Amino acid sequence: MRKINFFDTTLRDGEQSPGVNLNTQEKLAIAKQLERLGADIIEAGFPASSRGDFLAVQEIARTIKNCSVTGLARCVKGDIDAAWEALKDGAQPRIHVFIATSDIHLKHKLKMTREQVIERAVGMVKYAKERFPIVQWSAEDACRTELPFLAEIVEKVIDAGASVINLPDTVGYLAPAEYGNIFKYMKENVPNIHKAKLSAHCHDDLGMAVANSLAAIENGADQIECAVNGIGERAGNAALEEIAVALHTRKDFYQVETGITLNEIKRTSDLVSKLTGMAVPRNKAVVGDNAFAHESGIHQDGFLKEKSTYEIISPELVGVTADALVLGKHSGRHAFKDRLTALGFQFDSEEINKFFTMFKELTEKKKEITDEDLVSLILEEKVTDRKIGYEFLSLQVHYGTSQVPTATLSLKNQENAQLIQEAATGAGSVEAIYNTLERCIDKDVELLDYRIQSNRKGEDAFAQVYVRVLVNGKESAGRGIAQDVLEASAKAYLNAVNRQLVFQSNMSGLKNHTAVGS
């Protein structure tokens, strides 16, 4: 049975979602989970784009062993050199080079002729092949490229050494039949097509990314590029979880197999949602809260009599289970460690001791500690970048029906260890906190979105707050986790500000980090 490779671009195209700025530790946490999920290739970033991206790709390449790590590069020597330096220590290094091929891109963006684009693509594939054992080449905006020209350039880059050809629907324009026809045309009109795998990369601007990806598979694609939860630029990418489950559930139709470990899907989805701050819609296929809910009386009656009447996939298939194991104040170190292992975390004894101490402190405040609580506890500690920005120390809020809400905050500037204390009022408690924080950090911050989410039912549940803000005109997303919703609100605001400061720091080092060649 033909195997479909999954090329995950959550950390590259997915991170290009507005307001998403992941630090290196967050990217590494997602990469490790993608490895457990069974992704064949992880596109870890665009090494030439910034110092931060370069370092993140390098760290991921050095850490991941069971799948291939790749980086994006333009058909430019400087990009390829940066990608090699970032990826060369990886277990299975490969590169993803691209250049636009549609006439609209050639005329308005590249200012190049078709002949010049072919020459550049062939030359840079050869250059990349001198370093990388596997070179993937992409025809940006392939969906609006005339098919005879697309076939011509595909043939020539395969001759130059490309062993994977990606034909993206960059703007999410085509219908499934049209997109599938591109792959059929390449199979029938490129003489050396047997020397390369065909890859599909679909955007969801018209809501057809998953359908188009499946159409590509029907017409000969061997690789699908996708992102967890379908995140990405504009309306996003094809959702990894939807494609994987569709191919599994309808194996009778598609006659293909994948290496995806399906019961890791829900855990992966939750991790990406938490770290990016992008909530999963309740009605989202496969991983939404309502994916396995039945409201209609007729549906409920049929489901209770026989699940298969209205349920084509089981929750357990994708890792959703109702049997939640809870820990408490009497749980020992061994049970704690076993639970972390079951959740996919691997720590040394020193880290286990640190997290166990934090766990015990938490049990003094909460009677039952769920998996969600453990994940929140570890992510908050493990993936926080503590070198740049501000550290939350303490918060006091005075509020009553006849009082003006007043917040007092203490922060530490992590670059110079300066203690900062301020107080301010507001129309409500959250506004008072945010007014105080704006005074503390001396930045122009505008709140765009504010959302509260609970880990579970119960009065002692953790609150998770997600915010989107403009920091000096640049959008950033942040999350905060705490038992107290006001503390979580303060942490979310600070997290968003810190992400933007990290991003600015990474970009400031770009010029000294890599030179763009030709």
From Swiss-Prot:
GO BP field: L-leucine biosynthetic process
Pfam families xref list: HCS_D2 (PF22617), HMGL-like (PF00682), LeuA_dimer (PF08502)
Protein name: 2-isopropylmalate synthase
Swiss-Prot/TrEMBL catalytic activity: 3-methyl-2-oxobutanoate + acetyl-CoA + H2O = (2S)-2-isopropylmalate + CoA + H(+)
InterPro entries: 2-IPM_HCS-like, 2-isopropylmalate_synth_dimer, AIPM/Hcit_synth_CS, Aldolase_TIM, LeuA/HCS_post-cat, LeuA_allosteric_dom_sf, LeuA_bact_synth, PYR_CT
Organism: Bacillus subtilis (strain 168)
Protein's cellular compartments: Cytoplasm
Assigned GO CC terms: cytoplasm
SMART domains according to UniProt: LeuA_dimer
Keyword terms: Amino-acid biosynthesis, Branched-chain amino acid biosynthesis, Cytoplasm, Leucine biosynthesis, Manganese, Metal-binding, Transferase
Role of this protein: Catalyzes the condensation of the acetyl group of acetyl-CoA with 3-methyl-2-oxobutanoate (2-ketoisovalerate) to form 3-carboxy-3-hydroxy-4-methylpentanoate (2-isopropylmalate).
Enzyme Commission no: 2.3.3.13
Swiss-Prot/TrEMBL cofactor(s): Mn(2+)
Region (Regulatory domain): 391-518
